[in-house]
């Protein structure tokens, strides 16, 4: 028996060695097919998205994981330096004005991956954009003991960076090499607070020699199954002579750049302040810049209006709820809309067993996101997995048990999201809303202008307090709302 075991171990070792040797040949052949370049630059047009920021597209009311339609990027140019290693991409695009404006203004797309960020021992969120490229992937495969397997007509190279996920699990990067030694697809995963083990896939098609460099004609990247980035390549050049100049970081400019790595160090402790709004009714805040929550006590349960974000704030709020209302479960948590700054605390409430109340256009995205495995994460929901539960709001939903009433209304059309709802508490005449903040002394922004006729003329809500999820410097009232609207 011992002899058979030793033989099995020996065969496994031989297979592993053979796989590694085979991988080296596959890598060498693929690098040769791509021109054995030290650097490459390619250009054309591109598109990106505001990720996890469902917009207000009239053609498709269902909120996707991204802002639809995608944002165009003209004069897109990307340099990949395999020696440094480093990458830089730039382009001309547009931005939506700040502060609730819908005005489109010119902007700049800029994505920089430095040699330090591209180090495989550094946070994967900051380096993966380099290693998702065919050239970067092959470099990583050559330097990190890739293995090779056959799958679906491709040779699949697989390797792992040295950096580990929050859970301690290794990240895995796989690249699909076709029979012409071209990279068709590169995929990996990243732990995302809302989307769990988020699958990141980059596909490469239409490979051709652009008269100076082999490059794909089309690049498409998805995250969590949702559109994320696209490039149509019209020119490419291998080993450009001015690599150092092109790779220099751009001057600071406006615009939405590429994804960066997570912050470091422990977050400061959050001090929760409780304001009593009525019997069995409280507002929780952590001060300026907070994402506030309203806690509603019903006869047999608690309803939490907005979960707070990030998870640390949601955790602090849940602890405060248990002090305020001991022995009653948080049965519901209302989500005003599915933007990333309003969903960050939801995993904490899912772990608590709360049902998420959200507009029906948001359910498909949030259900898929929150029920994805979380093996790369180290949060409570990852340690104690629970299935996210939902109650969908169509145009209106009322929660009442004879002691307390909360009314939820879908507000549309508004420019911010197809899945926006507001919460109305009739007894105390409170309107609680996300992203419709008014600034005292200033006219209403485009979001507030859209909300005004819905709340005042269509729904005819009788409210005195106008409370935003985004904590302001001073309390807001209906009078402030009317003044901003010029009524």
List each language-model region with its residue ranges.
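Flexible, processing/modification-adjacent segments and terminal tails
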Residues: 21-26, 99-179, 188-196, 248-266, ...
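N-terminal mature ectodomain segment of secretory-pathway/periplasmic proteins
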Residues: 25, 29-118, 146-147
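Zn-dependent metallo-beta-lactamase
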Residues: 230-299, 397
């Amino acid at each position: 028996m011992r002899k058979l075991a030793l033989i099995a171990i020996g065969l496994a070792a031989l297979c592993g060695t053979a796989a590694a040797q085979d991988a080296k040949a596959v890598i060498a052949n693929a690098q040769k097919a791509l021109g054995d370049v030290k650097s490459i630059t390619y250009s054309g047009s591109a598109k990106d998205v505001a990720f996890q920021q469902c917009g207000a597209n009239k053609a498709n009311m269902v909120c996707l994981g991204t802002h639809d339609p995608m944002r165009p990027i003209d004069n897109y140019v990307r340099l990949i330096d395999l020696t440094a290693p480093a990458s830089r991409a730039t382009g001309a695009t547009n931005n939506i004005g700040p502060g609730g404006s819908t005005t489109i203004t010119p902007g700049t797309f800029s994505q920089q991956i430095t040699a330090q960020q591209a180090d495989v021992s550094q946070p994967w969120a900051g380096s993966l954009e380099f290693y998702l490229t065919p050239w970067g992937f092959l470099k990583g495969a050559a330097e990190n003991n890739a293995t090779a397997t056959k799958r679906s007509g491709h040779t699949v190279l697989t390797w792992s960076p040295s950096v580990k996920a929050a859970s301690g699990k290794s990240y895995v990067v796989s690249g699909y090499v076709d029979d012409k030694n071209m990279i068709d697809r590169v995929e990996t995963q990243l732990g995302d607070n809302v989307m769990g083990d988020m699958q990141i896939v980059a596909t490469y098609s239409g490979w051709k020699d652009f008269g100076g460099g082999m490059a794909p004609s089309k690049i498409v990247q998805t995250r969590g199954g949702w559109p994320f980035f696209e490039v149509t390549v019209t020119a490419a050049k291998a080993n450009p002579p001015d690599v150092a100049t092109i790779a220099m970081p751009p001057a600071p400019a406006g615009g939405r750049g590429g994804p960066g790595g997570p912050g470091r160090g422990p977050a400061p402790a959050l001090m929760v302040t409780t304001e009593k709004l009525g019997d069995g009714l409280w507002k929780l805040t952590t001060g300026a810049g907070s994402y506030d929550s309203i806690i509603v006590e019903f006869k047999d349960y608690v309803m939490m209006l907005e979960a707070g974000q990030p998870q640390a704030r949601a955790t602090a709020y849940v602890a405060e709820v248990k002090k305020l209302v001991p022995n009653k479960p948080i049965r519901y948590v209302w989500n005003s809309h599915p933007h990333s700054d309003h969903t960050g605390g939801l995993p904490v409430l899912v772990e608590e067993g709360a049902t998420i109340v959200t507009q029906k256009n948001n359910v498909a995205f949030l259900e898929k996101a929150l029920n994805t495995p979380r093996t790369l994460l180290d949060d409570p929901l990852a340690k104690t997995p629970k299935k996210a539960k939902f109650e969908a709001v169509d145009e209106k939903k009322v929660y009442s048990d004879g002691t307390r009433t909360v009314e939820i209304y879908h507000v549309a059309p508004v420019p911010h999201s197809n899945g926006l709802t507001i919460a109305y508490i009739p007894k105390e005449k409170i309107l609680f809303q996300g992203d419709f903040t008014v600034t005292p002394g200033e006219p209403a922004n485009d979001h507030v202008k859209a909300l005004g006729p819905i709340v005042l003329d269509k729904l005819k809500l009788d409210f005195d307090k106008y409370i935003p999820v985004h904590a302001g410097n001073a309390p807001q009232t209906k009078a402030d709302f009317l003044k901003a609207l010029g009524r």
